[in-house]
Structure formats: structure tokens, C-alpha cells
């Protein structure tokens, strides 16, 4: 089976590439060149028939991913499907099913069947439930069986923590972290490695993993098991050593035509973000960077969507290609529907803010909003807003008598005042 990368290397412009080129207003040659060299990916499993393809990477708009899925404390698949509907409503490009309890295949199959967004999973989360074995009883190649099952089901990308190998764990053990390993998948693999006194199975059998990805054109999202879970731990030796391992794994994947993106931090002080984005691009030769946040402070519990949006905007402006949303429930509980909505909107704002910096053409929508505000065209403002539904609701909650203003300024509306005076009209404030 040929992947999007293989086709690009041969100069074949696939239907998925055509769709992405039209969405992003890019030329055929630009897209082919950058997919061929790995700077742009189009995650598109051959079995995901409902997919509306999107590209991730150099010269493209920053994409947003929404996480959902059940845990052993919250098993309500119907609510998770409502989150999927909400993600579709806001035009989210990627959805990850992070279910880590029970038999997850039925939900995942339904997700692939109905979702036009690209679907991602973390197979190691599903290992215990799928294999019906406790962690210590799982064999190295058993993990590949889970990967194969996910690939065959139609998921477009998978987080695989292949970089936390024996070399990286050696560096980690010497680190003086406050929060050790905060990646769920990374912690599970590290525990397995320590209990079995064995190498990371995804690293040891990486070539077998690539064969699975090739068969279904699954994009590898190389997970950062050693991402910083606190600003104290950011940019330390453990994080960077794993990134170096991921750069080597990226090249091995490219050599056979498997598409790759790199996952990144995490928690990180705002002044470290730009350098980390540049470091990933340098080490991984321009591979797309997919970051969680980053959260720029550790004390925003209940408001971590704000911390994440601040970091995400800086990251996107500095080269990050996809942002994983953060909700107000981060670090506290499984998010509910309102949490998901708040997280989506905050992250879409961050992504767009970053795009204004790196893709000047993306300012056009903002300019249209500014014109609508000057013209006091409320309906146009609601249409252009990222969350126009909420904007309209808030406006109507204290609807002004004079629609040439809002209830904040009333007759002292600056826009209306200037519109009148520049037309040569008198301005009355009584």
C-alpha cells in the first residue's frame, strides 16, 4: 500500500491532496514538495471513508485536536458522542479517542464511521482491555497486535511513545524532576520496561510498527513520554534526549514513506516556547509539531484552558502546526460538554492568533470583523466570531434600545460617534 508521502515522492497528486490544496489555497507543486519531504502530512487511513482530509504542517493553518473518551470512573459513550458533535460544529480538524477502560472498539468504530475529522488513538491505553491481560503479563509483540487492530479500524494517526527507550530512560533517571513522567502512555511503558527489564517494545519492533502504518497509511504521531509536566521540568535533559530519539525515528519512518508528526510539551514558561519550537524543527527536519498547550503556568487549575491558549498562541506563531485543546477540567476531572466547548473555543482562538503571525492572509477574517464593528453590523459580527452563538446570546441578554450601540457604551459608543461626526452630523449624548 502506498501512503500520501509515497505518492508525493512519485509526483502523484491524490484526491486528498487536491482537497487540502483547495482548502489552504496552495499550489500543487508546493504541496507535493512538502509532503514528499515530510514537512506536511495528510493523515488519511484508507479505511476512514467519512474523512474530510486536512493537512498539517509548513505553510498551512494551525489545526486543533479535541481529546475525548471514557475512563473507569466515567463510562458514558453517549456523552462522548455529543462531544464529537460539538467538535464537528466548531470545525475541529482532529479528534483523539483516549478511552482507557474496557472494550473500546465499538465506540472507536462508530467514531471512525461518523467523523469527518481525522481520528487519533493511543493504542497503549487500550492494551489491557483489548488483550485482557494485566500490564506485567503483556508480551512485547502483544502491543503490536493492539496497534494493528486500531490501524485496521480506520484511525488516521496514532500516538506511539517509541522514543522512551533505554537511552532516554537512563537520562530520565538522572533528572531531578518535580513531576517525573506525566504522560499516561509513557508512564505505562516505563513501568512495563522496569517490571520486565526490557527495551521499549515500540522501539525494539519499530520496523514492524512501520509495516502496519504502511499497510493502512496511518500517520505516526511520535509521543513525548518525557514531556515536562511542570514549568520546572521544561527543556531538561530528559525532554531533549527523547526529542533526539524521535528525530532518528522520524527519519526511519520517512525512509519507507510513513508520515510523521512529533508531539511536544506540555508545561513550559512562556519565554522557552519559541526556542523549543525551533529546536523541534531543526532536529526533526521540519516534521509537523503537535503540542499540548503548552501551559505557561502550573497554578491555573480550573482555568487551564486559558494557560494553554496563551502558550498555544506563542507556539503556533513560532511554528507549531497543531494544538491539542486544553479544557478548564484539565488536571481535575473528565471534561463535560461545557468544558469541551470552552476548551475548543480557547484553542481555536490561540491557533488563529498564531496564524495571523505566520500566515498574513489569515488576518482577512479579522479585518472583516473590524469593518463590521465600525459599521455596527451585529449579525455580521456574530457570523464572523469564532463562537458567534455565545456572542449573540451575550448581546441579547442586555440588548440595547438603540442597536447602533451595545449596553456597555450606550450613546457614548465610539463607533457610532465617529460614524456620525465623519458624515458631518452633530453628535448628541442625551
From Swiss-Prot:
This is Phosphomethylpyrimidine synthase. Transmembrane segments: none annotated. Its EC number is 4.1.99.17. Pathway: Cofactor biosynthesis; thiamine diphosphate biosynthesis. Its cofactor is [4Fe-4S] cluster. Belongs to the ThiC family. GO terms for molecular function: 4 iron, 4 sulfur cluster binding; carbon-carbon lyase activity; zinc ion binding. It catalyses: 5-amino-1-(5-phospho-beta-D-ribosyl)imidazole + S-adenosyl-L-methionine = 4-amino-2-methyl-5-(phosphooxymethyl)pyrimidine + CO + 5'-deoxyadenosine + formate + L-methionine + 3 H(+). Disulfide bonds: none annotated. Zn(2+) binds at residues 267, 331. Catalyzes the synthesis of the hydroxymethylpyrimidine phosphate (HMP-P) moiety of thiamine from aminoimidazole ribotide (AIR) in a radical S-adenosyl-L-methionine (SAM)-dependent reaction. Keywords: 4Fe-4S, Iron, Iron-sulfur, Lyase, Metal-binding, S-adenosyl-L-methionine, Thiamine biosynthesis, Zinc. [4Fe-4S] cluster binds at residues 406, 409, 413. One of its GO terms (cellular component) is cytosol. GO terms for biological process: thiamine biosynthetic process; thiamine diphosphate biosynthetic process. Substrate binds at residues 67, 96, 125, 161, 183-185, 224-227, 263, 290. Homodimer. Binds 1 [4Fe-4S] cluster per subunit. The cluster is coordinated with 3 cysteines and an exchangeable S-adenosyl-L-methionine.
